[in-house]
Amino acid sequence: MIDFRPFYQQIATTNLSAWLETLPLQLKQWEKTTHGDYAKWAKIVDFMPNSTACINLKDKVESIPHTPLSVGETKQLTHHLKQLMPWRKGPYHLHGIHIDTEWRSDFKWDRVLPHLAPLKDRTILDVGCGSGYHMWRMVGEGAKMVVGIDPTELFLCQFEVVRKLLGNDRRANLIPLGIEQMQPLAAFDTVFSMGVLYHRKSPLDHLLQLKAQLVKGGELVLETLVIDGDVNTCLVPADRYAKMKNVYFIPSIDCLINWLEKVGFKNVRCVDQAVTTLEEQRKTDWLENESLVDFLDPNDHSKTIEGYPAPKRAVILANA
């Protein structure tokens, strides 16, 4: 099982120390209700080699072992990594193995990074972090500490496997909780919420939860689905959107800016918008499920299979 005690020790003398009032008990409760495959997934972490490696987190997430793996070792490592499928966010280049994930998350990072306040020496929260790809890119930008939260057990085990292959780097940590379970810490310099808002039944509550984690003046990085329209435009799918049953609100950019200002964010601005392409989200050998092409109208990729506008994403920055 994953041991969270090193993280508790790590934050005990930081601005996150107040979290220790609630977090250990929450994670003990979490361990009692984990997915049936969690023990199997967590055991795979133990199979990862302890070899030293050259690490690159600046322009990719890559580990190159000082002593190359043999053919047999590479085959065995690939087998273990494939047991943690599906790999959704990446890509990773680990010990000579290319994990070609469903999403080219580096595309999103390249769109977001130029607009951010410098991440060097910052304490960062990544909400809905998945397996942690963007967390490692934040570390590559010099972040002091990155904490990701995501309640999905598979993502936690994927993260811990990657961490081990990156030399057990402790600058990034994944905590398997949701934002709604966090006490207001007001301790993070930057908070990321990317690909989360449209899954929330109460988007304004989510924005308030994000704000409660930021230091005064701290930066919010919000990336979410948007729709064309004016300040009064917001799509509420009748049933599914792109085959997803948990999509509730897709606002226009102006509507989203209005929401952020309404809950007290300052200096709200849209810095990027992009239609999701079949190059950015696609099926690979590391994903057995359907992907974007299956979610779009086969005769008109400008629409989802349900007839809604195809996915378009915007990046909004704001300050607490």
UniProtKB/Swiss-Prot annotation:
The lineage of its organism: Bacteria, Pseudomonadati, Pseudomonadota, Gammaproteobacteria, Pasteurellales. Belongs to the class I-like SAM-binding methyltransferase superfamily. CmoB family. PANTHER family: METHYLTRANSFERASE, TRNA U34 CARBOXYMETHYLTRANSFERASE. It comes from the Bacteria. One of its GO terms (molecular function) is transferase activity, transferring alkyl or aryl (other than methyl) groups. It comes from Actinobacillus pleuropneumoniae serotype 7 (strain AP76). It is an enzyme of class 2 (transferase). Its EC number is 2.5.1.-. This is tRNA U34 carboxymethyltransferase. It catalyses: carboxy-S-adenosyl-L-methionine + 5-hydroxyuridine(34) in tRNA = 5-carboxymethoxyuridine(34) in tRNA + S-adenosyl-L-homocysteine + H(+).
